[in-house]
Amino acid sequence: MARKTPIEHYRNIGICAHVDAGKTTTTERILFYTGLSHKIGEVHDGAATMDWMEQEQERGITITSAATTTFWRGMEAQFPEHRVNIIDTPGHVDFTIEVERSLRVLDGAVVVFCGSSGVEPQSETVWRQADKYHVPRMVFVNKMDRAGADFLRVVDQIKNRLGANPVPIQLNVGAEEDFRGVIDLIKMKMINWNDADQGMSFTYEDIPADMIDLAEEWRNHMIESAAEASEELMDKYLEEGELTEAEIKQALRTRTLNNEIVLATCGSAFKNKGVQAVLDAVIEFLPSPSDVPAIKGVDEKDNEIERHADDNEPFSALAFKIATDPFVGTLTFMRVYSGVVNSGDAVYNSVKEKKERFGRIVQMHANKREEIKEVRAGDIAAAIGLKDVTTGDTLCDQSHKVILERMEFPEPVIQIAVEPRSKADQEKMGIALGKLAAEDPSFRVETDDETGQTLISGMGELHLDIIVDRMKREFSVDCNVGKPQVAYRETIRGKAEVEGKFVRQSGGRGQYGHVWVKLEPSEPGEGFVFVDEIVGGVIPKEYISSVAKGIEEQMNSGVLAGYPVLDIKATLFDGSYHDVDSSEMAFKIAGSMAFKKGALEAQPVILEPMMNVEVTTPEDWMGDVVGDLNRRRGMIEGMDEGVAGLKIIRAQVPLSEMFGYATDLRSATQGRASYSMEFNEYAEVPKNFADKIIAERGY
């Protein structure tokens, strides 16, 4: 089959935002105007097409990023048909992992802000993640019909709080109840959408007389930003004072793709105003797969190689999401970076080093699906029938192996024990947890060796609530849930050189492993680093990886209170072996003995998760809120002015002090304050608290 849509006409975009900015409604309207969903779904009624898991419809927040394919030809059918793949991303703090995962496979993003509440803490997180993956983006300031909506104030916040360079290409006409439409600064016309047909039709009108000066001022700002794209344009602009519409668009596109500017548009998705203009901007200013740099990966020999968005290159794709579907089993969402693959073809999972076969390939539309015969470079689709693929694995052509970069996933910060209510639930719970863990790398399952309890850990209380809820709904598992526990960690602050010697002689073949290891802290966040400095074969090559394995396994339970150990550098520098008695097992045990001994000598400490907490409160209660955060061992980092005279307090607080905070804050401020919290880093626990933790663990 030939390619239906040229790759230049693809747009793979994400729609990202803070919780109530109206992202799902915006996506819904996009689906409506592109002709896919005939009745508009409202999140308030729990009926939005993109939010396809039951819990999302109940809670009215988006949890899983569903991928949807739509087609668009422009508000005035001015473009050839473009294929737009949309990934809807969650905006709740506990699901930051989903956002990270979807940004990884996108080419561009539309970031939605609320016209009245503007840039909120989670928006900053999403913005930083998009910076990390160099995703070109544009902004849609939504909810212009809300009380307190102010487009230019939000543009100002994007500049000052996010350090971005926003360039408005529209202005709003009226705001709050009087919001009527937008001014297109490129055409210098007002766009007026028709309320009678849900904004399907629109007219261009003259700009209201009282807005002409403001429109001229912002148009000049936009043209100056465009002229900075090249010296030729700047010279032309300085000489003639004007650029053509085509020149402006081309220049704004170039600068957006280079991540130099962020174009800003506005509207109200709920009131059906402005969404089609966002779609037009996606086509005109955001990249196609061939506009973004080739994806880098490594081949079998660890040499760096690139894969370009081209059907003629070998097949390569990244699995970015695993979802369990009650009807077809496991759906593996993938972004195809190069080549072509047909349903029924064999492919290779280069991370797991296993062959896989695509049973069927489906294109998703939120929760409906259409079977397709093949996928090509630039496509986003889901495969059915893959046996052992987890998030972040690479699928590729077997004779051209490549591993595309792995995604990094955060350490979970909160843990609860779950117990099945009956014998029948026991087995079902194991299966359910296994499937849920395959879908979500920020969720872990382990068994406590001492108590035999099953522990699940994740990114926050809501995250784990939803996991327990899904076990009940999707796998009908009833379980009792323990009290949330903090996921503490351990590390070392000092250095130690230690000997680990494992010798056993008792008739027949003995055991002999002997190592000298230097332990020291590695860089924060670097994890376990193993350095082999053995010279002259004092330990044979084949035993060295066993020493590393022994140390790494022992790091699962630390020496102070049995918590996993982070950020250790271990250097193996000496040792000895026995011709007959040495084995991999003996060296593994010697490695773990050395670690146990060394960790005790190298100033071991307990670490706790520190959270970035932002509290928004009326001024009257500010003193109480700050006092309460100080009592919770919080460090106040700063205060900002919020909207409508509210104050925003930023602090770092240990997670262990934040349980039940929502209730305490509500009662202290008569329900007027709100807060958000996300993981920042692991930090050392003060000595008196550490002693308490060690005593509680019975060490």
Swiss-Prot record:
PROSITE patterns: G_TR_1 (PS00301), G_TR_2 (PS51722)
Gene this protein is translated from: fusA1
Annotated ranges, domain tr-type G: 8-290
Gene3D superfamilies reported in the protein's UniProt record: 3.30.230.10, 3.30.70.240, Elongation Factor G (Translational Gtpase), domain 3, P-loop containing nucleotide triphosphate hydrolases, Translation factors
Name of the protein in question: Elongation factor G 1
InterPro entries in UniProt: EFG_II, EFG_III, EFG_III/V, EFG_IV, EFG_V, EFG_V-like, EFTu-like_2, G_TR_CS
Primary location recorded for the protein, binned into one broad class: cytoplasm
UniProt organism field: Vibrio parahaemolyticus serotype O3:K6 (strain RIMD 2210633)
Function: Catalyzes the GTP-dependent ribosomal translocation step during translation elongation. During this step, the ribosome changes from the pre-translocational (PRE) to the post-translocational (POST) state as the newly formed A-site-bound peptidyl-tRNA and P-site-bound deacylated tRNA move to the P and E sites, respectively. Catalyzes the coordinated movement of the two tRNA molecules, the mRNA and conformational changes in the ribosome.
GO cellular component: cytoplasm
Cellular compartment(s): Cytoplasm
Gene Ontology molecular function: any one: GTPase activity
Similarity-based family: Belongs to the TRAFAC class translation factor GTPase superfamily. Classic translation factor GTPase family. EF-G/EF-2 subfamily.
Binding sites annotated in the UniProt record for GTP: 17-24, 88-92, 142-145
Superkingdom of the source species: Bacteria
Gene Ontology biological process terms from the UniProt entry: ribosome disassembly
SUPFAM superfamilies reported in the protein's UniProt record: EF-G C-terminal domain-like, P-loop containing nucleoside triphosphate hydrolases, Ribosomal protein S5 domain 2-like, Translation proteins
Annotated keywords: Cytoplasm, Elongation factor, GTP-binding, Nucleotide-binding, Protein biosynthesis
